[in-house]
């Protein structure tokens, strides 16, 4: 009789442990899903920051160019190299963009 009760106790413990393992797996799965969602949100936030940064850079590049164009349109003689060099700014902008793309790649 004791051996039957011992066997029942062992089976009950085994089933309890199996259920706990399944619950742990489910919890880990949920944590994994939450972590993936958090990573996606972080990536989205970084992409938004990079986009805003790129817009600010483009405005900084286009601002001096626009000033030169307006000055020329108003009849002033303007040496564009004293204000800006388009190739220099384009190269800088592209270098920064590439570095950000490489930084946030998967």
Swiss-Prot record:
Protein known as: Minor capsid protein VP2
Free-text domain note: The N-terminus domain points away from the virion surface.
Family that this chain belongs to: Belongs to the vesivirus VP2 protein family.
Top-level taxon of origin: Viruses
Cellular localisation: Virion; Host cytoplasm
Span of the signal peptide: none
Principal location class: virion
Subunit structure: Homooligomer. The portal-like structure consists in 12 copies of VP2. Interacts with capsid protein VP1.
UniProt xrefs under Pfam families: Vesi_VP2
Record-linked InterPro entries: Vesivirus_VP2
Any one GO CC term of the record: host cell cytoplasm
Keyword Membrane: no
Additional observations: Translated by a ribosomal termination-reinitiation process from the bicistronic mRNA coding for VP1 and VP2.
Keyword terms: Capsid decoration protein, Capsid protein, Host cytoplasm, Virion
Known role: Minor structural protein that forms a portal-like structure at a unique three-fold axis of symmetry, following binding to the host receptor. The virion attaches to feline junctional adhesion molecule A (F11R). Once attached, the virion is endocytosed. Acidification of the endosome induces conformational change of capsid protein thereby injecting virus genomic RNA into host cytoplasm. The channel formed by VP2 may allow the delivery of the viral genome through the host endosomal membrane.
């Amino acid at each position: 009789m004791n051996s039957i009760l011992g066997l029942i106790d062992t089976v009950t413990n085994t089933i309890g442990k199996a259920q706990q393992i399944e619950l742990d797996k489910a919890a880990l799965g949920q944590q994994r899903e939450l972590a993936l969602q958090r990573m996606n949100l972080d990536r989205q936030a970084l992409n938004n920051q990079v986009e805003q940064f790129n817009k600010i850079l483009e405005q900084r590049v286009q601002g001096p160019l626009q000033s030169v164009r307006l000055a020329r349109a108003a009849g002033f003689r303007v040496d564009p190299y004293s204000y800006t060099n388009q190739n220099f700014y384009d190269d800088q902008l592209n270098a920064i963009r590439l570095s950000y793309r490489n930084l946030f790649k998967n």
